[in-house]
Amino acid sequence: MSVKNISSAILGVGVDDTTIDLFESQYPVPTGVSYNSYVIRDEKIAILDTVDDRATDEWLANVTEALAGEKPAYLVVHHMEPDHGANVARLAALYPEMQVVGNAKTFQYMEQFFGAEAIAKERRVVVKDGESLSLGAHTLTFVFAPMVHWPEVMVSYESTEKVLFSADGFGRFGAVAKFDEKADWASEARRYYLNIVGKYLSLIHI
């Protein structure tokens, strides 16, 4: 997957992984998976989520292309599971002036994954449920979504273009490049929901 234009300002920089055979080492994924990540270009540039270590090089190439020589102001971390957050520390090291946005639990998990010094406290933007971050013409509003499917998960809504960045909330097995509109799209979405999110239904309050 190369850089995709979601809109004139929102770019998809995620990566398809068609070599993986088991998601989380237990769920068969014959058509692979996609690691979703985005860049919002505005007065302040934001990168939304990273990707799994399996896809680091391709993802960094996509990010570099999307940035077009500019530097990001923010990295927004919706979810710390490795398929979303494995490259947080690596990106922070590449862009030392970039701030990292997450909630309090996000940074607890980050320290467990990367160590307390990976993201200096002065670089952390700790958001609360319902708070917003302005990038210029675009604004992200954060909504906590605990147990979809880890305790720290949050989603963000961009109000100008009306785009929801939903973390695992509307996930589906299968790489984007392998998506067939004629196939039963719902079956893989249903299988993902039941196996990844559904087991926590009693704990979900959104």
What are these regions (language model features)?
Residues 3-65, 155-158, 162-166:
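Conserved beta-strand hairpin/beta-sheet module of binuclear metal-dependent hydrolase folds
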Residues 4-8, 101-153, 200:
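Metallo-beta-lactamase
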Residues 21, 164-180:
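Short, solvent-exposed beta-strand-terminating loops
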Residues 43, 54-101:
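Active-site metal-binding motif and surrounding structural segment of the metallo-beta-lactamase
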Residues 46-49, 73-77, 141-142:
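Short catalytic-loop micro-motif centered on adjacent basic/acidic residues
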Residues 80-85, 107-110, 149-150, 171-174:
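Active-site environment of divalent metal-dependent phosphoester hydrolases
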Residues 173-196:
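Active-site gating loops and adjacent loop-to-helix segments of metal-dependent hydrolytic enzymes
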Residues 205-206:
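Conserved small/polar residues in nucleotide/adenosyl-binding loops
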